[in-house]
């Protein structure tokens, strides 16, 4: 019940700021999609919904791109939870944004897929387009696995649609 209450206020949070907020460094993303999109057995695929925060004020410019920290979490339709923090690169090609990321995190299977370990690693690629100066709509594809450090390592591939807003 509390989860549904929280979801009801996400749109308020996203659209309550003035459009000139694009100069600020905080970026909040909400996303929804499919967990275990390449499920060969057909019994673990489910929906996922998540939220992610990026603080662009903490970026580092390097010779291979601009990097900033990212923190987020998602829950699946089978009560699996993944909480993560990592690093994301940003490559802006006009209105198109490409953002690869890597994040270790804590995974709890709930009634969903057993990934073999509580420590799981998420690698992701996002491709988005700027809707306004401070809003972006994108597609992301991620892979989560434990690098064979767990009892088993089935991994999972996920895809989602992401809406991001700068505050």
Predicted regions located by residue number:
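Cleavable N-terminal export/targeting peptides
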Residues: 1-25
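Residue-level signature of outer-membrane beta-barrel architecture
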Residues: 53-57, 89-91, 129, 143, ...
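Short loop/turn motifs that connect adjacent beta-strands in outer-membrane beta-barrel proteins
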Residues: 19-25, 41, 56-67, 92-98, ...
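Outer-membrane beta-barrel "beta-signal"
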Residues: 47-51, 129, 154-167
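Transmembrane beta-strand segments that form the barrel wall of outer-membrane beta-barrel proteins
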Residues: 28-36, 64-76, 99-108, 140-145
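Outer-membrane beta-barrel initiation region
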Residues: 22-56
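Membrane-embedded beta-strands that build the outer-membrane beta-barrel scaffold
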Residues: 51, 87, 98, 125-127, ...
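Solvent-exposed loop/turn segments connecting transmembrane beta-strands
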Residues: 37-47, 73-84, 111-118, 148-156
